[in-house]
Design a protein with these regions (language model features):
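Glycine-rich, proline-tolerant flexible connector loops at the mouths of alpha/beta enzymes
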Residues: 48-52
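A short alpha/beta connector and helix-capping loop motif
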Residues: 16-43, 47
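Short acidic, Gly/Ser-rich segments with clustered Asp/Glu that frequently serve as metal-coordination loops
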Residues: 9-15
Length: 174
């Protein structure tokens, strides 16, 4: 198992996210548990390209302080929603013989959704810990509705196993 921390960058990791405090706590808890149990923590950052607010070289591009990578932890950069497309992540995980990926981060309805579905299609067992992904309100639904739609309906039993933080930690321990 690996813990994949997706797009938890300063620009978008804000208190405007749905259920921010629970999200922040869940992600911090899972990162700490992964490290304690020798589960590799891998980060992914999104780059919208030159001139965008979310691009390499801007302050908002860096990982949120509360989730900072340790020296030596892998960081993959992407330019599309899926963490697997053109990043080297797929090849890295296959080379390490990884079968299970626990996914946390942002945003539920964009990069988390794409990463879970693509990971599933690449043959990985995808784990989604409760409250460890979030999103913002949008023109069609509030963040809470997006969160519940994906976590409780779309992914569960189709593309991923949606479990509690405690269950995820139990699995990290083997």
């Amino acid at each position: 198992m690996v813990l994949l921390v997706v797009d938890t960058q300063k620009l978008i990791t804000t208190t405007d996210l749905y259920n921010f405090n629970a999200f922040e706590n869940a992600v911090k808890t899972l990162i700490a548990a992964a490290r304690e149990n020798n589960v590799e923590v891998i980060y992914v950052r999104h780059d919208d390209g030159v001139g965008a607010e979310l691009t390499k070289g801007t302050p908002g591009f860096e990982i949120y302080e509360g989730f900072s990578p340790w020296s030596g932890e892998k960081i993959f950069d992407k330019t599309v929603n899926s963490s697997f497309k053109g990043t080297g992540l797929l090849e890295y995980l296959k080379a390490k013989n990884v079968h299970t990926v626990a996914v946390v981060g942002l945003q539920t309805d964009y990069c988390i959704d794409a990463t879970i579905k693509c990971g599933f299609e690449h043959g990985f067992k995808m784990i989604v810990p409760e409250n460890a992904n979030s999103t913002f309100d949008n023109a069609f639904m509030i963040g809470e509705q997006s969160y519940k739609y994906y976590n409780e309906f779309m992914w569960k039993g189709r593309y991923a196993e949606c479990v509690s933080v405690e269950e995820t930690i139990k699995r990290m321990k083997g």
